[in-house]
Amino acid sequence: MEPSADTHSKPVDIYRDTWVRFLGYANEVGEAFRALVPVGAVWASYGVATTYVTADAIDKGRKAAAAHGERPGKAVCVCVAVVDTFVWQALASVAVPGFTINRVCAASHFLLSRTTRWPLPVRKWTTTAIGLSTIPFIITPIDRSVDLLLDSSLRKLYSEGEKED
């Protein structure tokens, strides 16, 4: 989430370049606290992240519609923008990091229960702290990996469609 060196050529994307981006990580916080809170709280954190993903997709669709104007193919342009954003956000903000934090916490709790004699509450809080501390380290690698995945798969379909127009 560092501001890019070339801030003059690209407008700020509120969903990716500001504090709003952290709403996409709400489910990771929920996963980190899974051992300490009711499962409903974890699911609620996924609701926050999903709302964030949906808002970004709608925003990108509106911007694509405005940029396209009244030229033919507007619906396709908007659809591509919405699908690309939704898939990217669903992977980079919800699915991959949620799974990653869930597994880090599960492995941490398992290892702590096997290697320490700490009381259960201490193990749970330690697991939560490990999960939360992992979040800053996984964000950039996951974002870049999802970009690479989409660039080598789904986005190739979009660019082929643009060449045909």
UniProtKB/Swiss-Prot annotation:
For this UniProt record, the keywords arranged alphabetically read as follows: Apoptosis, Membrane, Mitochondrion, Mitochondrion inner membrane, Transmembrane, Transmembrane helix
Keyword Transmembrane applies: yes
**Gene Ontology biological-process annotations:** apoptotic process; mitochondrial fission
Give the UniProt subcellular location, in the record's own words: Mitochondrion inner membrane
Q: Which GO terms describe its cellular component?
A: mitochondrial inner membrane; mitochondrion
Q: Does the keyword Nucleus apply?
A: no
Q: How does it sit in the membrane?
A: Multi-pass membrane protein
What the entry lists under InterPro entries is as follows: Mitochondrial_18_kDa_protein (IPR019560)
- Superkingdom in the source lineage: Eukaryota
Membrane-spanning residues: 35-55, 76-96, 130-150
Principal place of residence:
mitochondrion
Q: What does this protein do?
A: Involved in the mitochondrial division probably by regulating membrane fission. Loss-of-function leads to apoptosis.
Family designation: Belongs to the MTFP1 family.
The protein depicted here goes by the name Mitochondrial fission process protein 1
Taxonomic source organism: Danio rerio
